Amino acid sequence: ISISDPSFLTCTANDFGYKSVFSRFVEANAVKNDLVLAITTSGNSENIIEVCKYCNLKGIKVISLTGKLNSPVSKISNCDICTPNGNYSDRVQELHGIIIHILVELVEKKLFA
């Protein structure tokens, strides 16, 4: 499930702060043995750190896509796929897009093969 509903994001940010927008959604919807894909170019995004912390408390696995080695998010993820590329965040995001396509293809093969 993509956490991208503008109404949810706006209401949650307004009521609880932007730091909690993703963790509140996961809290309401995820269960143990689910998997969260956390994507952050810097690896320092507070809202992504919060959702990773929540997942760790609840036994929810986290795969992170980051752009900096040893970032806070990479340290609290079960698996970090890091694409360090200096100060070029656009390159990191392009690589993340490719990785997401590969992950989707792998999941589809596993589910529908």
Residue locations for each model-derived region?
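Glycine-rich phosphate-binding loops that contact phosphosugars or nucleotide phosphates
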Residues: 1-113
